[in-house]
Amino acid sequence: NYMVLNSEYDYYNYINGTIPYVSHTAEGIFVNRTAVCDGYSSAFKLCMDILGIPCEIITGEGDGVAHAWNAVMLDGEWYMVDVTWDDPVPDNPGVVNYDYFNITDEKMRRDHSYTSDINANGTKYNYYAQQENYFTNTTDYYEYLNKKLSEALESGVENATVVIYVESLDEPIDREFIDAYTDYSKITANYHSIGSSSRYSSYVMMIVWRLS
């Protein structure tokens, strides 16, 4: 969070081909407050080294462009971390994304390509896995939404917002699922209006339900 909230990607110099050396280093993050991917990854590794947490810098490509990020070991399992891609561009003060925080090789390889001897298969410390509103199957998803709808009805509130994160499979399938639940909720929840908006990352669909 500190790195994302207190620095920004050196986009101006990147698009103009004028990236200074310091933006490739941890100094770019901690002193100049601006850097490119290898500056982010170097700064993250420095923090992990100080904390005594095993960490490596991984290089490869992100969406076909040369890129650098990190692998970190927690409780004997490796995870992939891409701080650069979790920092919004252009800079959005106060906003931190967690789509690339402690994810597996399988998820990282959806838009990153690389060769590494490290096998990142850890899931316990993935950001979303630590949240009660993250689901990998529709059964738990339904139960959670029904619970939140019931709580809202019982409390007597006129408007309610429920945010969930779902393991995304395929956008058309996900859309059908959202529409089906919307129709179901209109009948069972006694709300006059129920709608949703969604945002996709490489593997997570965030759905915001607004009820009134």
Where are these regions (language model features)?
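Generic solvent-exposed, charged/amphipathic alpha-helical segments
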Residues: 1, 45, 178-179
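Secondary-structure boundary elements
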Residues: 1-29
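Acidic/polar residues at beta-strand termini and the immediately following turn/coil
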Residues: 6, 10-13, 82, 197-201
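Extracytoplasmic/periplasmic, Sec-exported soluble proteins
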Residues: 29-40
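Hydrophobic/aromatic-rich core segments of domains that either
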Residues: 39-106
